[in-house]
Regions:
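Short alpha-helical segments that sit at the start of domains
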Residues: 1-16, 41-44, 63, 73
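Short, locally clustered residues in the helix-turn-helix/winged-helix DNA-binding domain
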Residues: 18-22
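Short acidic, hydrophobic short linear motifs in intrinsically disordered regions
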Residues: 24-34
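Residues that mark the N-terminal boundary/hinge immediately upstream of a DNA-recognition element
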Residues: 27, 66-68
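Short amphipathic alpha-helical interaction segments
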Residues: 36-51, 62
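Short, Lys/Arg-rich nucleic-acid/phosphate-binding segment
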Residues: 59-65
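Short, amphipathic alpha-helical interaction segments positioned at domain boundaries
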Residues: 69-79
Length: 79
């Protein structure tokens, strides 16, 4: 196994992650609206992303995570 581990996200995970923002907190209803899914689906996806450490407890994206040239599936922590 070579290289760093990168989380593999489903299309729904990627849409919900794009709907979150590092600057301010959004409700599950707003995230669901932006991601094109129901609020309860967005909430369960946010919980799954929180377990994977891709979103904070308040639903915000961590400040130092940036999208890379590989797209929405791969996120890297920048030093």
């Amino acid at each position: 196994m070579s290289g760093a581990w990168r989380p593999q996200l489903s299309a729904l995970d990627a849409r919900v992650l794009r709907a979150t923002d590092a600057r301010y907190e959004r409700s599950p209803e707003k995230v669901g609206e932006l991601a094109g899914c129901a609020a309860d689906v967005a909430l369960s996806t946010l919980r799954r992303l929180r377990i994977a450490c891709l979103v904070e407890d308040d639903g915000e994206r961590p400040q130092r995570w940036l999208r890379t040239h590989r797209g929405d599936v791969a996120l890297e922590l920048q030093p």
